[in-house]
Amino acid sequence: MEMEEVLSEVIQRIRPSDEERAFVKGLMEELRTIAEERIEELGLDARPYFVGSLAKDTYLAGDHDIDLFLAFPLETPLEELRKKGLELGKAIAEKLDSHEIAYAEHPYVRARYRGVRVDLVPCYDVGNWRDVRTAVDRSILHTRWVNENLRGRNDEVRLLKRFLKGINAYGSEIYVRGFSGYLAEILVIKYGSFLDVVEKADFLLRQKIIDPENWLRKEPEVALKTVKRETEEDRPLIVIDPVDPRRNVSANLSWEKYGRFYFKSIEFLENPSVGFFFPPEKPKGSYLDELRKRGTALVTLLINVPDMVDDVLLPQLERSARGFERTLEREGFGVLGWDVGRKGRAFIMLELDRERRERVKIKPGPEFFTERGRDFYRKNEKVWLIGKRLYSEKLVRESVVDVIIELLEKNQVSLGKGIRDAIRRADILLNYVPKELEEEAYLFLSREKWNIKG
């Protein structure tokens, strides 16, 4: 297909219909009315704002999550905002179909109404970046900036969002680390269209710094501090937030997800296809078949951490997986890869070159004529010399599961601070996972989870 045909077909599938727009508009009007009534009933000084893709008209057909922010005056103490904001959110949610309390920087209410998820989030009623007190406050400014600058390019944003979803690079959540919707909107506003953005996949990487509101000129001291900090963190891109020079919009974007975007953009421009936007479902496979084919071993730790949110949990799981990788390699096992996540219980998967090691481990020691050499000689039962260096041996546990248990008992693995105790109590499985993890184990072992050529 020609490029124009591809884009035309995709737009027809992702642009909301008139009926869908009418439904969304009516829903938002109902929610605004309910919010205003509840604010008045409770005697609160607050204003409801819709933020996010519905408020900017950059949402994809069928994607109707609503973000309703409940903005309190700047002089409101933070604890009072949290308390009254949650009270107001609950009062609004009582008029809806169902709700629960969720937690981010502060508690908020997650509700359902007419089949649509509605997040009711307390925030400050900010006018500019200097007013920002909490992370969510910027959302009001983001919505305002996009609406003022998009100038009818809504479908271009939709194309970019759908492309990023199709290549598995969309979402700034900690378990994705891709492009946020706001970043997609900024790139279209800055460069003009979906095609302009994908054509600049290489240029963006080389340019590195994107400053749509010229903060480096208007607030050089603040903006340069942001650039320096993010450069030291080795980010793929530094996109200075158009509404706040202190923030890099692409701070959560990983090199892996940018690399995926980089190669898929090249492939799409060479051979345009609707499949980039709506890829076929990958064939399912058996993790046990993969294990047999690879001749490797799979160790899975199942960890109970019910009250920990993903943004806190996942970095700690990753740190722990790296700790296991380093320690097991010191113990003589080759770690070919690891995977972490949560499917009910949290998990750490480790692929190893083998499940058992030799019963005897050689211990290289120091040179014999040193104080450490004399100490090594005293402490070991069998000692021999090769040249100037001392050597000994010791009997060790062979099974990797036994080795892991011993390492955890002796506190010899660097683990995430908040989950150390939970990992010590983890169930450790060898070459087996429960049913809910079978697909994850296959995707991990086959590397289809990360394969950018698929």
UniProtKB/Swiss-Prot annotation:
Quaternary structure annotation from Swiss-Prot or TrEMBL: Homodimer.
Binding site for ATP: S53, K56, H142, K161, Y170
Documented EC number(s): 2.7.7.72
Species annotation: Thermococcus gammatolerans (strain DSM 15229 / JCM 11827 / EJ3)
Chain sites annotated for binding Mg(2+): D65, D67, D119
Gene3D superfamilies in the record: Archaeal tRNA CCA-adding enzyme catalytic domain, Beta Polymerase, domain 2, CCA tRNA nucleotidyltransferase, domain 2, Poly(A) polymerase predicted RNA binding domain
A Pfam family of this chain: NTP_transf_2
Similarity field: Belongs to the tRNA nucleotidyltransferase/poly(A) polymerase family. Archaeal CCA-adding enzyme subfamily.
Binding site for CTP: S53, K56, H142, K161, Y170
An example Gene Ontology biological process: tRNA 3'-terminal CCA addition
GO MF: ATP binding; CCA tRNA nucleotidyltransferase activity; magnesium ion binding; tRNA binding
Keyword terms: ATP-binding, Magnesium, Metal-binding, Nucleotide-binding, Nucleotidyltransferase, RNA repair, RNA-binding, Transferase, tRNA processing
Alphabetized InterPro entries for the sequence: CAA_C, CCA-adding_arc, CCA_tRNA_nucleotrans_2, NT_2-5OAS_ClassI-CCAase, NT_sf, NuclTrfase_I-like_C, Polymerase_NTP_transf_dom, tRNA_NucTransf2
Catalysed conversion reaction: a tRNA precursor + 2 CTP + ATP = a tRNA with a 3' CCA end + 3 diphosphate; a tRNA with a 3' CCA end + 2 CTP + ATP = a tRNA with a 3' CCACCA end + 3 diphosphate
Cofactor(s) for this UniProt protein: Mg(2+)
The organism's place on the tree of life at top rank: Archaea
Note: A single active site specifically recognizes both ATP and CTP and is responsible for their addition.
Identification of the protein by name: CCA-adding enzyme
Record-linked SUPFAM superfamilies: Nucleotidyltransferase, PAP/Archaeal CCA-adding enzyme, C-terminal domain, PAP/OAS1 substrate-binding domain
Known function: Catalyzes the addition and repair of the essential 3'-terminal CCA sequence in tRNAs without using a nucleic acid template. Adds these three nucleotides in the order of C, C, and A to the tRNA nucleotide-73, using CTP and ATP as substrates and producing inorganic pyrophosphate. tRNA 3'-terminal CCA addition is required both for tRNA processing and repair. Also involved in tRNA surveillance by mediating tandem CCA addition to generate a CCACCA at the 3' terminus of unstable tRNAs. While stable tRNAs receive only 3'-terminal CCA, unstable tRNAs are marked with CCACCA and rapidly degraded.
